[in-house]
Amino acid sequence: MPELPEVETTLRGVSPHILGRKVTDLVIRQPRLRWPIPLELSEQLPGQQLKAASRRGKYLLLSFNTGTALIHLGMSGSLRIVKPEEPPLFHDHFDMHFGNRILRYCDPRRFGCLLWEAGDIHQHALLRDLGPEPLGDDFTPAYLYERSRKRTQAIKQFIMDSKIVVGVGNIYANESLFMAGIKPIRKAGALSRHMCEDLVRDIRFVLQRSITQGGTTLRDFVGGDGKPGYFQQQLLVYGRGGEACKTCQKPLKEIRMNDRTTVYCVTCQQ
């Protein structure tokens, strides 16, 4: 499932090709995604200029003259830039034409979306309750410490809650907690200020390093240039249950938390 680094990688890959250009056509081949694509967009978008392209959590935001297109990649979605002569594949569900280049959306499992908001996009129902960006100034050790007080849920579940902080998906939660030396099953409310400092630092580091590597490719994800991400080659714990810890050489423990794979070192993480 594309997470924050994959979405950021996509944004950086496609935006230079379309920013400032006008939409010349919107071709919707399959409107039935997680939520139906508004068919009226085919008439509304042509002629509008792409003013800005940004990311909020795992959502891509394309800002035009009269509103904002909100795109989510779902479980298996990807966006890529193609030439007009390149024929669509079976799972390519919509094309946003910008003259001689096309922003093409592919989604085999169809859990993604293309929605439209004419008003303040940050007040959209999908965005207004989101927590701070993990790479932004508002995500601080003090913030994490205060939000975690009296919380009895496991710290891994806590940092994966998008109302606490956005974009820390399962892979990156596993990796960040290992680097910070914190067991994923530790109660969030039991974190000290020093632990919060370490965890914020390592969440930032892991996400930034993944962005630099183009994201993590486990199944369907490819970046905006159609190439896979390479962060998977640097994973320390995720997907390595039973293998030797790269720090202490003891076997990594794998458990299920909220039906998600969780891997950690019982020696290095406290």
From Swiss-Prot:
Entry-linked SUPFAM superfamilies: Glucocorticoid receptor-like (DNA-binding domain), N-terminal domain of MutM-like DNA repair proteins, S13-like H2TH domain
Names of required cofactors: Zn(2+)
CDD domains with a match to the protein in the record: EcFpg-like_N
Statement: the UniProt record of this protein carries the keyword Zinc-finger: yes
Keyword Zinc attributed: yes
Domain of life: Bacteria
Catalyzed reactions per annotation: Hydrolysis of DNA containing ring-opened 7-methylguanine residues, releasing 2,6-diamino-4-hydroxy-5-(N-methyl)formamidopyrimidine; 2'-deoxyribonucleotide-(2'-deoxyribose 5'-phosphate)-2'-deoxyribonucleotide-DNA = a 3'-end 2'-deoxyribonucleotide-(2,3-dehydro-2,3-deoxyribose 5'-phosphate)-DNA + a 5'-end 5'-phospho-2'-deoxyribonucleoside-DNA + H(+)
Keyword entries, A-Z: DNA damage, DNA repair, DNA-binding, Glycosidase, Hydrolase, Lyase, Metal-binding, Multifunctional enzyme, Zinc, Zinc-finger
Biological processes per GO annotation: base-excision repair
Zinc fingers (FPG-type) by residue: 236-270
Cofactor, how bound (note): Binds 1 zinc ion per subunit.
Active site per the UniProt annotation: P2, E3, K58, R260
EC number(s) from the headed UniProt entry: 3.2.2.23, 4.2.99.18
Residues noted as binding DNA in the record, renumbered to the chain: H91, R109, R151
A Pfam cross-reference name: Fapy_DNA_glyco
GO molecular function: 8-oxo-7,8-dihydroguanine DNA N-glycosylase activity; class I DNA-(apurinic or apyrimidinic site) endonuclease activity; damaged DNA binding; zinc ion binding
HAMAP family for this protein: Fapy_DNA_glycosyl (MF_00103)
Subunit-level organization: Monomer.
Family: Belongs to the FPG family.
Free-text function comment from the UniProt entry: Involved in base excision repair of DNA damaged by oxidation or by mutagenic agents. Acts as a DNA glycosylase that recognizes and removes damaged bases. Has a preference for oxidized purines, such as 7,8-dihydro-8-oxoguanine (8-oxoG). Has AP (apurinic/apyrimidinic) lyase activity and introduces nicks in the DNA strand. Cleaves the DNA backbone by beta-delta elimination to generate a single-strand break at the site of the removed base with both 3'- and 5'-phosphates.
Protein name: Formamidopyrimidine-DNA glycosylase
Source organism (scientific name): Cellvibrio japonicus (strain Ueda107) (Pseudomonas fluorescens subsp. cellulosa)
